[in-house]
């Protein structure tokens, strides 16, 4: 699963997830993309589950790009531990997702297969997504 090799600090503040995505909001590498319509958090497990679903559907042909990376640690205190005594240990890693962010890209397959693969991937994700194509410049 994806997670940073090194971080300057082990734990982070929560922070707010506001605004729209400006960076990573267009299809850059492939021909087709899966774009988020809502804000939310995407865990490393969800990123991997969606990638596996797409890869299996396209039968390993074409190329898939993952455009997001889980760089935010989420901490959790153990069960039945009283409040206080510091912040809990890192449980998993997430990526903050803003509306308009391209999550995955694909090329080398037909549009019909890409749509089906992205539909399978979207069912693994906790927010609404849409299918987008690369616009000619």
UniProtKB/Swiss-Prot annotation:
Domain of life: Bacteria
InterPro entries with a match to the protein in the record: Ribosomal_uL16 (IPR047873), Ribosomal_uL16_bact-type (IPR000114), Ribosomal_uL16_CS (IPR020798), Ribosomal_uL16_dom (IPR016180), Ribosomal_uL16_sf (IPR036920)
Keyword field: Ribonucleoprotein, Ribosomal protein, RNA-binding, rRNA-binding, tRNA-binding
GO function terms (MF aspect): rRNA binding; structural constituent of ribosome; tRNA binding
Gene3D superfamilies per the UniProt record, alphabetical: Ribosomal protein L10e/L16
SUPFAM superfamilies in alphabetical order: Ribosomal protein L16p/L10e
GO biological process: translation
Any single GO CC term annotated in Swiss-Prot or TrEMBL for this entry: cytosolic large ribosomal subunit
Role according to the record: Binds 23S rRNA and is also seen to make contacts with the A and possibly P site tRNAs.
Sequence similarity: Belongs to the universal ribosomal protein uL16 family.
Subunit structure: Part of the 50S ribosomal subunit.
HAMAP family: Ribosomal_uL16
Name of protein: Large ribosomal subunit protein uL16
Designated gene of the protein: rplP
């Amino acid at each position: 699963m994806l997670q940073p090799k090194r971080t300057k600090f082990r734990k982070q503040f929560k922070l707010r997830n506001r605004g729209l995505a400006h960076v990573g909001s267009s299809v850059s590498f492939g021909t087709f993309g899966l774009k988020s319509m809502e804000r939310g958090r995407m865990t490393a497990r969800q990123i991997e589950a969606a990638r596996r679903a797409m890869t299996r559907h396209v039968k390993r042909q074409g190329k898939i790009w993952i455009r997001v990376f889980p760089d935010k640690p989420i901490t959790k205190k153990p069960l039945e531990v009283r409040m206080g005594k510091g912040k809990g240990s890192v449980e998993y890693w997430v990526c903050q997702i803003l509306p308009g962010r391209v999550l995955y890209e694909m090329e080398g397959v037909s549009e019909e297969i890409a749509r089906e693969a992205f539909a399978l991937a979207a069912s693994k994700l906790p927010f609404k997504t849409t299918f987008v194509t690369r616009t000619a410049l």
